[in-house]
């Protein structure tokens, strides 16, 4: 009787600008505090595409082959000797950022700001668009039975929305402006509504995406064309009947940031989520004399348990955001689909024996 074939670890690897390959990597062995995961669902993020097209994002440069992917869920295959809270067969969502040391940022609970943090698919750290992947067990969270693998993978972008709404102080009764109806804008809309926002208006260039925003809960939408930032602000105020207390900017576009400052209520908060140019001209005086606080967002921290609770309780529904699914073997086709701007969230299915949501 022939021996069973050893499982392969097919992985999606970027070698440099425009050079994306499917390759077989060795199956890693988990350390004492790690788990080996059989990957199931991994979403494609804009950052993955940037590394593919440009080979870099800012100072993060692909200098050696790197496995992509960081929006992920999977099943525990093997546990390290010191892992007590997980066992083989557990379904988990993966928080991609795991601190390497207990530095000053970890001590105050803001580990996302740690300069030495491990983060999936950020050079030089490999991601998890592969069959098998090992990760710090403390940053793998068990999924309830009523939360699917795909919902588990969506916790990563959902966490950006949670962190942004926390930074903005979104609470009961607030009017909120969300600039941008891409995946991050959409999850921010969902979180703002779940946190008690009375009205949320979403702006975007795309009528199709704004239609989806209305479908998932936006109270108001505004399609942008060639208006000035001041005109956009006036239109937002006209729709809401007042200026929003919180604006969450998810595009990174300079004109959108400017509109956000003009639009936000005096004493309110503008949260910058989208990453654009390093240098951007903004009407800072207009923010200063009206005490509009401008806050940044870098990834997230302490969000996975909250996100899991929101999904399990059906406080948010991320399923409508998933528009395309591809097996890992067709990852190159999936990335081309993303590049063409088709769909919203594209999922890659990494387990050849389980392509279900």
Swiss-Prot record:
Catalyzed reactions:
xylitol + NAD(+) = D-xylulose + NADH + H(+); L-iditol + NAD(+) = keto-L-sorbose + NADH + H(+); keto-D-fructose + NADH + H(+) = D-sorbitol + NAD(+)
Q: Which GO terms describe its molecular function?
A: D-xylulose reductase activity; L-iditol 2-dehydrogenase (NAD+) activity; zinc ion binding
> Per the UniProt record, which EC number(s) apply here?
1.1.1.-, 1.1.1.14, 1.1.1.9
* SMART domains recorded: PKS_ER (SM00829)
Q: How is the cofactor bound?
A: Binds 1 zinc ion per subunit.
Task: Tell me which Pfam families the record gives.
Answer: ADH_N, ADH_zinc_N
- Binding residues for substrate, per the UniProt record? 51, 156, 299-300
* GO cellular component labels: mitochondrial membrane; motile cilium
Residue positions annotated to bind Zn(2+) are 45, 70-71
Q: What Gene3D superfamilies does the record tag this protein with?
A: Medium-chain alcohol dehydrogenases, catalytic domain (3.90.180.10), NAD(P)-binding Rossmann-like Domain (3.40.50.720)
**Topological category with respect to the lipid bilayer:** Peripheral membrane protein
Q: Where is it predominantly found?
A: mitochondrion
Q: What does this protein do?
A: Polyol dehydrogenase that catalyzes the reversible NAD(+)-dependent oxidation of various sugar alcohols. Is active with xylitol, L-iditol and D-sorbitol (D-glucitol) as substrates, leading to the C2-oxidized products D-xylulose, L-sorbose and D-fructose, respectively. Is a key enzyme in the polyol pathway that interconverts glucose and fructose via sorbitol, which constitutes an important alternate route for glucose metabolism. May play a role in sperm motility by using sorbitol as an alternative energy source for sperm motility.
Q: How does it assemble?
A: Homotetramer.
For this entry, the protein name equals Sorbitol dehydrogenase
The organism named in the record is: Pongo abelii
């Amino acid at each position: 009787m022939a021996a069973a074939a050893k499982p392969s670890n097919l992985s999606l690897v970027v070698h440099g600008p425009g050079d994306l390959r499917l390759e077989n990597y060795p199956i890693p062995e988990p350390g004492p505090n790690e788990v080996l995961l059989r990957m199931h669902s991994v979403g494609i993020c804009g950052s993955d595409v940037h590394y593919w097209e440009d080979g870099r994002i800012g100072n993060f440069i692909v200098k050696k082959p790197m496995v992509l992917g960081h929006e992920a869920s999977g099943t525990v295959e093997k546990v390290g000797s010191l892992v007590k809270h997980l066992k083989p067969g557990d379904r988990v969502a993966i928080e991609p950022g795991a601190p390497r040391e207990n530095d000053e940022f970890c001590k105050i609970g803001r580990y996302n700001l740690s300069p030495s943090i491990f983060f999936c698919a950020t050079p030089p750290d490999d991601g998890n668009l592969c069959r098998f992947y090992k990760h710090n067990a403390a940053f793998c969270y068990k999924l309830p039975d009523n939360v699917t693998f795909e919902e588990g993978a969506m916790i990563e972008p959902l966490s950006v929305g949670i962190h942004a709404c926390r930074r903005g102080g979104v609470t009961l009764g607030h009017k909120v402006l969300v600039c941008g109806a891409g995946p991050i804008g959409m999850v921010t809309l969902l979180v703002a509504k779940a946190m008690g926002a009375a009205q949320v208006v979403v702006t975007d260039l795309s009528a199709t995406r704004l239609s989806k925003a209305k479908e998932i809960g936006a109270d108001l939408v505004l399609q942008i064309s060639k208006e000035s930032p001041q005109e956009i602000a006036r239109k937002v105020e006209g729709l809401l009947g007042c200026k929003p207390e919180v604006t969450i900017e998810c595009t990174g576009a300079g004109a959108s940031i400017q509109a956000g400052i003009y639009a936000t209520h005096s004493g309110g908060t503008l949260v910058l989520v989208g990453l654009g140019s390093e240098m951007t001209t903004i009407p800072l005086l207009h923010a200063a004399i009206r005490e509009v606080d401008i806050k940044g967002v870098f990834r997230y921290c302490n969000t996975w348990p909250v996100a899991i609770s929101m999904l399990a309780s059906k406080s948010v529904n991320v399923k409508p955001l998933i528009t395309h699914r591809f097996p890992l073997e067709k990852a190159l086709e999936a990335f081309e689909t993303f590049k063409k701007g088709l769909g919203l969230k594209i999922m890659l299915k990494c387990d050849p024996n389980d392509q279900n949501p």
